[in-house]
Structures are given as structure tokens and as C-alpha cells.
């Protein structure tokens, strides 16, 4: 049945070639992707970023201070969840690449069927169950891993969809720019919804902690009414659930818009071959492509740097800087700055090239990270650093997704008989970044445990503040510099990219001529 469906889909696509206004009829590439289609495609990127930003900024502090999971076990949850998430990416990518074409396409059905289960599991991540101990750890670990699996079933096909919304590289680059703008806007929404709803609640802290027992924190709260403390903590937990519900509603809405507003286009050169390949064959081909390895290695280091920032910035602002009541607003400024500067970086990479944009964009945050750690606590300075960090975050968001299609085009030219590997390219990039995220969260939370982090304390020991400074400044700066050094080896510059574009255009035109001749011969017979 799958083969019959695939043949029918292929025949349908070939049958459309004589229709007026079809993409094949326009060999000069005049049929550009509409702005509406680009916007609908871009909106599909919001759910992953909204949920990812909320989890990245707030899950650690939620587990530590609201669910009151001890730091060691919180590190296990965060690390295991992200590593599991990383493992599922290449597996989902492989299964997506083996999917047969349907009326919706090959990729969009994954979006449709994963969405309802993803939103339920996301809600349960932010729910504090009525039990404690190992059962609570298992609860968060199961639903965190389940959500990461389901959101992967959404995001990997969506990422691969970049290659199938248009045959024109300029359209794909433009759509990527739209997508990055919406995705960074999604991080603003995630930060705003989670931060502002939760930030309205005054989560109580404990001035003096005498002793803490595993899963059953025993504290002496001086000058703090215990009844008020319990009620306030309960209202904070409710606020987290309300924020999760709002985010889930946006998730579903974005999935509907993506499904209804975007149509997959099966590329002309892909129709020439549908030879089956195993997971290991596809993986071997992809991982032997040197430009891809160099690209993802460079972004692995820079992504790890920004994930360390994301995972620890809220704790740094709350405890080291002392901005307990302002941290959600500072995070919001970071994301707003990133959103507003994505169009600038889109223009910059078009004008000066993508490698140049990498060097300028990602390195721009370094002096401000050093400044915020060396200077005394200053709210105005914190907002200045937030704006500068947003500028660099925008570049870090845009550039990988803008450069991956160039690597895939280069792969297609060097492996003309191998098709359908696009999901593996995207999924393995996401695999490495998520693995880096798991490592960063696990190491940072474990480091805080070793430094003596005190759950719900109003202030932390000096060792904890020093650890947060290392996680916010020293480690990210070193990782960014290593990543930028590796980008020197990346071979696809602007000249090479333009050569690949011309070569692919010639292949597509040749294939269209061949298809047209075959159809004409068949009609004559």
C-alpha cells in the first residue's frame, strides 16, 4: 500500500506539470513562494521555541524552588531528559525520511499527530504531584522525556520542510528569515507568558536554613508566616500551570496554521530516485560529508555557550545580582532585543556573507558578559547587557538554519544518486545541540549542588555565586572562542554557495526537460 501511495503521489506530481501556472511550467523560477506561505511556515516554528524557552529559563528554578526537588536529582532529570531528547532526534529523522507521501505530504502528518499528545505531556511537566521522593523524580523524568520525544516528532519534520517549501534557494533563505523572526518572537512569548504570569506571584524565600533533609526540607523560617508561605507557594504552582495552559493553546494554534497554510513540494530531482536505504547507510553518508561535520562542530560549541547562559541566567539574576523581582523583565528584554535584530542579521548575511555574520554576531556578546560579572550589581547595566545578549542570540538563532540548506545543496551535488536524507541532516544537528544542552544543564545543576545551593533561600553562599559567575561568563566565553576558531575550517563561503546554486539550477532545468519529453512521448503513444 505504501508503494502504491508513493507511485500515485509521484504520478500526481508528474501529471501537474502540464497545468498552467504549475512550478514546472515556469523554468525561469518566476513562481516565488508567497508571503502568506512564508508566514504560515514561519509560525510553525513558534511552538518549539516557546516551549523550549520556557523550559530552558524556568524548569531548573521550578524544580529547585517550587517542586523542591534536591539539586542532585534535578540535575539527573534535566540531563537525562535532554540526552533522551537528543537520542530521539536522529531516530525520528530516519523514520521521517522513510515516510511515504500522503495528501498532506511526507512531513506534515508528523506535525498533526504529535501535537495533541505533546500539549498534554507539557502540561504535566509543570504539575506538582501530591507525592514526593523517588516517585516525584520519576514523574518529572517520564513526562519531560515524553514531551521531548513528541516535540521532536513535530520539530524534525518541520525543520526538514525548509527543503520542500520551494525549489529556489532565495525563497528558502527568505522563508528561513521569516521563520527565525517568528521563532525569536516565540522565545519572547515563552519568556513573557511564563515570566509575567509566574512573576506576579511572590514566591517566598527562607532567610535562615538550619538543615535540609532529602525530599522533606526542614527549615526554620524567621519573620515569615508559615501559613502564608504554604498558600503563596501553592499560588505560584497554580501560576506555572496557567502559564503552561496558555502556551499549550498557542502550540495547537500554530500547528493548525502550519498544516493549513503550507504545501510540501516534492523537488524535481528527487523524483528520479527513490532507492531504499538503511538508517546506517544514510547516517554514514551524512556524517562523511565534511562541510556538515565542520558546521555542526562549530555550532556545537557556540550552542553550548548560549545554553549555559539560558539555563543559569535566571538564577544568576535572582541570587548573584539580587534582582529577584526583576529577572523575568530582564529575560524579556533579551528576547525582545533578539526579535528586533533578526531582520538586521538577515540583511547582514545577505550583504557580507554568512561566515562573516557568524564571527560578528556570535562574538558580540563576549565583552558584555565580562562586564556584567566584573562590575557591581547594577540594574541599568543588567538591561544594557540584556540588549547586547539579545543581539548575539538573534545571530545564534538565524545562522545555523540559514547555513544548513547550503550544506545540503553541497551534499546533493556530490551525491546525485542519494535522496531523502534532508531529515537526517537536520535531526543530527538538533541531536548535537540538544546533547550539548543536556550536558550544560546537568553540569551546571550538579555544580550548584556541589557549591552548596540552598533550595528557596533568599541568598546563596558565596561559593554558589562564584559558580554562577563561572557558568555565565567564563565557560561561555571559552566555548564561543573555540566555536569561532572551528568556523575557519568551514569551506562553503559565498563564492562556493553561488556556484552550488547555479549547478543545482542546471540540474533542475535538465530534469524538467527530461520529464517533459517523457510525458510528450507517452501522450503520443
Curated annotation (Swiss-Prot):
Disulfide bonding pattern of the chain: 205-458
One BP term from GO: transcytosis
Keyword Transcription assigned: no
GO cellular component: endoplasmic reticulum membrane; plasma membrane
Pfam families documented for this protein: MFS_2 (PF13347)
Glycosylated position list: 216, 225
Topology, Cytoplasmic side: 1-32, 95-106, 163-169, 261-291, 349-352, 415-424, 488-525
Record's catalysed reaction(s): a 1-acyl-sn-glycero-3-phosphocholine(in) + Na(+)(in) = a 1-acyl-sn-glycero-3-phosphocholine(out) + Na(+)(out); 1-(4Z,7Z,10Z,13Z,16Z,19Z-docosahexaenoyl)-sn-glycero-3-phosphocholine(in) + Na(+)(in) = 1-(4Z,7Z,10Z,13Z,16Z,19Z-docosahexaenoyl)-sn-glycero-3-phosphocholine(out) + Na(+)(out); 1-(9Z-octadecenoyl)-sn-glycero-3-phosphocholine(in) + Na(+)(in) = 1-(9Z-octadecenoyl)-sn-glycero-3-phosphocholine(out) + Na(+)(out); 1-hexadecanoyl-sn-glycero-3-phosphocholine(in) + Na(+)(in) = 1-hexadecanoyl-sn-glycero-3-phosphocholine(out) + Na(+)(out)
Subcellular location: Cell membrane; Endoplasmic reticulum membrane
Keyword Coiled coil carried by entry: no
Residue spans crossing the bilayer: 33-62, 74-94, 107-126, 138-162, 170-201, 227-260, 292-318, 330-348, 353-374, 378-414, 425-451, 464-487
Keywords: Cell membrane, Disulfide bond, Endoplasmic reticulum, Glycoprotein, Lipid transport, Membrane, Symport, Transmembrane, Transmembrane helix, Transport
Disordered: annotated span: 1-29
Extracellular topological intervals: 63-73, 127-137, 202-226, 319-329, 375-377, 452-463
Highest taxon above the source species: Eukaryota
GO MF term set: lysophospholipid:sodium symporter activity; symporter activity
PANTHER family membership: MAJOR FACILITATOR SUPERFAMILY DOMAIN-CONTAINING PROTEIN (PTHR11328), SODIUM-DEPENDENT LYSOPHOSPHATIDYLCHOLINE SYMPORTER 1 (PTHR11328:SF29)
Family named by the database record: Belongs to the major facilitator superfamily.
Function: Sodium-dependent lysophosphatidylcholine (LPC) symporter, which plays an essential role for blood-brain barrier formation and function. Specifically expressed in endothelium of the blood-brain barrier of micro-vessels and transports LPC into the brain. Transport of LPC is essential because it constitutes the major mechanism by which docosahexaenoic acid (DHA), an omega-3 fatty acid that is essential for normal brain growth and cognitive function, enters the brain. Transports LPC carrying long-chain fatty acids such LPC oleate and LPC palmitate with a minimum acyl chain length of 14 carbons.
Protein name as catalogued: Sodium-dependent lysophosphatidylcholine symporter 1
Organism the protein comes from: Xenopus tropicalis (Western clawed frog)
Amino acid at each position: 500500500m505504501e508503494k502504491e501511495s508513493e507511485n500515485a503521489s509521484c504520478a500526481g506530481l508528474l501529471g501537474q506539470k502540464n497545468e498552467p501556472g504549475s512550478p514546472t511550467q515556469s523554468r525561469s523560477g518566476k513562481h516565488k513562494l508567497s508571503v502568506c506561505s512564508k508566514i504560515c511556515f514561519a509560525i510553525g516554528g513558534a511552538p518549539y521555541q516557546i516551549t523550549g524557552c520556557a523550559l530552558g529559563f524556568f524548569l531548573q528554578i521550578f524544580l529547585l524552588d517550587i517542586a523542591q526537588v534536591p539539586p542532585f536529582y534535578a540535575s539527573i532529570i534535566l540531563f537525562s531528559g535532554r540526552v533522551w531528547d537528543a537520542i530521539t532526534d536522529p531516530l525520528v529523522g530516519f523514520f521521517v525520511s522513510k515516510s511515504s507521501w500522503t495528501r498532506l505530504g511526507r512531513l506534515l502528518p508528523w506535525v498533526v499527530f504529535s501535537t495533541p499528545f505533546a500539549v498534554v505531556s507539557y502540561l504535566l511537566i509543570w504539575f506538582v504531584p501530591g507525592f514526593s521522593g523517588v516517585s516525584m523524580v520519576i514523574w518529572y523524568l517520564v513526562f519531560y522525556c515524553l514531551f521531548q520525544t513528541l516535540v521532536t516528532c513535530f520539530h524534525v519534520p518541520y525543520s526538514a520542510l525548509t527543503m520542500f517549501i520551494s525549489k529556489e534557494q532565495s525563497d528558502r533563505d527568505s522563508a528561513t528569515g521569516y521563520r527565525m523572526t517568528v521563532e525569536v518572537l516565540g522565545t519572547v512569548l515563552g519568556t513573557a507568558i511564563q515570566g509575567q504570569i509566574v512573576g506576579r506571584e511572590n514566591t517566598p524565600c527562607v532567610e535562615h536554613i538550619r538543615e535540609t533533609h532529602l525530599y522533606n526540607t526542614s527549615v526554620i523560617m524567621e519573620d515569615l508566616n508559615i501559613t502564608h508561605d504554604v498558600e503563596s507557594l501553592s499560588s505560584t504552582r497554580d501560576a506555572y500551570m496557567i502559564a503552561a495552559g496558555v502556551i499549550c493553546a498557542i502550540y495547537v494554534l500554530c500547528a493548525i496554521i502550519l498544516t493549513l497554510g503550507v504545501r510540501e513540494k516534492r523537488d524535481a530531482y528527487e523524483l528520479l530516485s527513490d532507492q531504499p536505504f538503511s538508517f546506517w547507510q544514510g547516517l554514514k553518508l551524512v556524517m562523511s560529508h565534511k562541510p556538515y561535520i565542520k558546521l555542526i562542530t562549530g555550532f556545537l560549541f557556540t550552542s553550548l555557550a548560549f545554553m549555559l547562559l539560558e539555563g543559569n541566567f535566571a538564577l544568576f539574576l535572582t541570587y548573584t545580582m539580587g534582582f529577584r523581582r526583576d529577572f523575568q523583565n530582564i529575560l524579556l528584554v533579551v528576547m525582545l532585543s533578539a526579535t528586533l535584530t533578526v531582520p538586521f542579521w538577515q540583511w547582514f548575511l545577505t550583504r557580507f556573507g554568512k561566515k562573516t555574520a557568524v564571527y560578528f554576531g556570535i562574538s558580540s556578546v563576549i565583552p558584555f558578559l565580562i562586564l556584567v560579572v566584573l562590575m557591581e550589581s547594577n540594574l541599568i547595566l543588567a538591561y544594557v547587557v540584556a540588549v547586547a545578549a539579545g543581539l548575539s542570540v538573534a545571530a545564534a538563532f538565524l545562522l545555523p538554519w540559514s547555513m544548513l540548506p547550503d550544506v545540503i545543496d553541497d551534499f546533493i551535488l556530490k551525491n546525485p544518486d542519494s535522496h531523502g536524507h534532508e531529515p537526517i541532516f537536520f535531526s543530527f544537528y538538533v541531536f548535537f545541540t540538544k546533547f550539548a544542552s543536556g550536558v550544560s544543564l546537568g553540569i551546571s545543576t550538579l555544580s550548584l549542588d556541589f557549591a552548596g545551593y540552598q533550595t528557596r533561600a533568599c541568598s546563596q553562599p558565596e561559593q554558589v555565586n562564584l559558580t554562577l559567575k563561572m557558568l555565565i561568563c567564563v565557560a561561555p566565553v571559552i566555548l564561543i572562542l573555540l566555536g569561532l576558531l572551528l568556523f575557519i575550517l568551514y569551506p562553503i563561503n559565498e563564492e562556493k554557495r553561488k556556484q552550488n546554486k547555479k549547478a543545482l539550477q542546471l540540474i533542475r532545468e535538465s530534469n524538467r526537460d527530461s520529464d517533459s519529453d517523457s510525458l510528450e512521448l507517452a501522450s503520443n503513444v
